[in-house]
Amino acid sequence: MPNRAFKQSNIRNFSIIAHIDHGKSTLSDRLIQHCGGLTDREMAEQVLDSMDLERERGITIKAQSVTLYYTAKDGETYQLNFIDTPGHVDFSYEVSRSLAGCEGALLVVDAAQGVEAQTLANCYTAIEMDLEVVPVLNKIDLPQADAMGVAQEIEDIVGIEAVDAVQCSAKTGLGIDDVLERIVRQIPPPKGEPEEPLQALIIDSWFDNYQGVVSLVRVRNGTLRAGEKMTVMSTGQSYQIDKVGYFDPKPHETGILHTGEVGYVISGIKDILGAPVGDTLTNTKSPAKEPVPGFKKVKPQVYAGMFPISSEDYESFRDALGKLSLNDASLFYEPENSAALGFGFRCGFLGMLHMEIIQERLEREYDIDLITTAPTVVYEVEKTDGSIVKVDNPVNLPAVNDIETIYEPIVEANILVPQEFLGNVITLCVDKRGVQTAMAYHGKQVAVTYELPMAEVVMDFFDRLKSTSRGYASLDYQFKKFEPADMVRVDILINGDRVDALAMITHRDHAEGRGRMLVDKMRELIPRQMFDIAIQATIGNHVIARSTVKQLRKNVTAKCYGGDISRKKKLLQKQKEGKKRMKNLGNVEVPQEAFLAVLKVGK
């Protein structure tokens, strides 16, 4: 274990940028193993993906960090601080967070697959943040690997030198030495003054039931010592620092972090919002003048209502959301009340995958059963009196005669797709009301840029893009502007009563089709009662689709055989009146599957 007071010129902070399945987690496993971070016995697959969900889906969701010591060929020992990054488009915010703590990034590209759109987006983020990007070609042991072709593709599409890109195979361990040497040689050491007042950037925070809030920090200037008092700059709160150390990948307490190092701080913060991600820690006695320029605050793009199935879970649901939002700064939530579903929260997410992951984490880690309403994006509504309101819930859309114009959010989507699937992708984009703005050919790949309504992208665009291109197309998108659109609210009425949780905002062209699909689906899901149930889809007072769940009837004429017809008529008339009375008094139970049906509309 080298001496802790490490030369600043021998510290290297880096991240790995890669698309899902290009071997980022495996490469990080190899680096840890090579530098002796873990024994062979402890080497679980995907060491840094510590969440079960991450291992199951094979994706990285949270940022993690590990400190390794590597003795290079020049005889010097280097401290490598590696901050893991997620690759999925929904977690791009986590990526910019991880990159804010680094001076360099390894751009890992699968030598058999080539460059993908998300890798490209994350790579541009790294270049904007002035990081040194080192291209690495992985999976070089595969028979279909084409190192030269992919290196050329990196130069064409990304625009960085890749002729002498490092070639390695994370699976077999081939070329790992070259990767480490390249990190030491190409990535610059951290800048920063040990003598200046302390500035430490919080890259991530999570809640530990025994120790309170644990923060992962990168020290920009000064030194962080256990026992001293620190101040969180945005809140002005001060805390006593209890423990300081780094991960190798297990926590290793050292009591001090020097300039340029990455490690963890525990200071007994019990309040979940005590150490927000992206904030700066400084010394209480000699505070820094200004915080470290953090990274962009991210706005939720998709909103959905979440309601616990049993109302007793409401309190624990609120606590669980609080703990998750500490660790996931992009999650937004506020209380909401629905006539159909009771008390719950309106939550904001970065995208559909983010929403699924949060829902699954709530159900798994906190054991809460939830119903989620249909996701919507944020619309801007200009009212007739000239005021503009933002609407993220169909229920809050003003009355039709109060609306002047509805503006919907448009995203710029960059899609990379092999040439043979280009036709399918264009058809899909046109179907989703997209407008093509650019197209460029790079070798076998085509890069197309579309302006698409965010509402269409949110619903099921990602899944359909993957299925029309056999999984080869990749997508990256960012918000561009608001644009006027002919949007309407479709309400679902059951026996004349509006069900608020089933309302949706959609384009007028699609309203009838979606209304019809939803009504038909509801008819299958609502159980038959002793009276007819009318299910209607309406826009304002105009009914656009209707369907009826037929009543259950007893055969009242069974006991009459032969005899007078008027006897039968009398019995049927009596039954009819009874049903009518029932219909006025009866209320319809809507099963939970019916609320989930809304999510499937449009598929």
UniProtKB/Swiss-Prot annotation:
Q: Which Pfam families match?
A: EFG_C (PF00679), GTP_EFTU (PF00009), LepA_C (PF06421)
Q: Which InterPro entries match?
A: EF-4 (IPR006297), EFG_III/V (IPR035647), EFG_V-like (IPR000640), G_TR_CS (IPR031157), LepA_C_sf (IPR038363), LepA_CTD (IPR013842), LepA_IV (IPR035654), P-loop_NTPase (IPR027417)
**SUPFAM superfamilies linked to this entry:** EF-G C-terminal domain-like, P-loop containing nucleoside triphosphate hydrolases
Q: Could you tell me the membrane topology recorded for this protein?
A: Peripheral membrane protein
List the subcellular locations: Cell inner membrane
Q: CDD domains under this entry?
A: EF4_II (cd03699), EF4_III (cd16260), LepA (cd01890), lepA_C (cd03709)
First-listed, main subcellular location of the protein, grouped into a coarse class: membrane
Organism's domain of life?
Bacteria
Q: Which residues bind GTP?
A: 21-26, 138-141
Q: Which GO terms describe its biological process?
A: positive regulation of translation
A GO CC term assigned to this protein in UniProt:
plasma membrane
Instruction: Reply yes or no: does the keyword Membrane apply.
Output: yes
What's its catalytic activity?
GTP + H2O = GDP + phosphate + H(+)
Q: Which SMART domains does the protein's record reference? A: EFG_C
Question: GO MF terms on file?
Answer: GTP binding; GTPase activity; guanosine tetraphosphate binding; ribosome binding; translation elongation factor activity
Q: What is its EC number?
A: 3.6.5.n1
Q: Where is the tr-type G domain?
A: 9-191
Arranged from A to Z, the UniProt key words for this protein are: Cell inner membrane, Cell membrane, GTP-binding, Hydrolase, Membrane, Nucleotide-binding, Protein biosynthesis
* Family that this chain belongs to: Belongs to the TRAFAC class translation factor GTPase superfamily. Classic translation factor GTPase family. LepA subfamily.
User: What functional role does this protein have?
Assistant: Required for accurate and efficient protein synthesis under certain stress conditions. May act as a fidelity factor of the translation reaction, by catalyzing a one-codon backward translocation of tRNAs on improperly translocated ribosomes. Back-translocation proceeds from a post-translocation (POST) complex to a pre-translocation (PRE) complex, thus giving elongation factor G a second chance to translocate the tRNAs correctly. Binds to ribosomes in a GTP-dependent manner.
Protein name (record): Elongation factor 4
Give the gene name: lepA
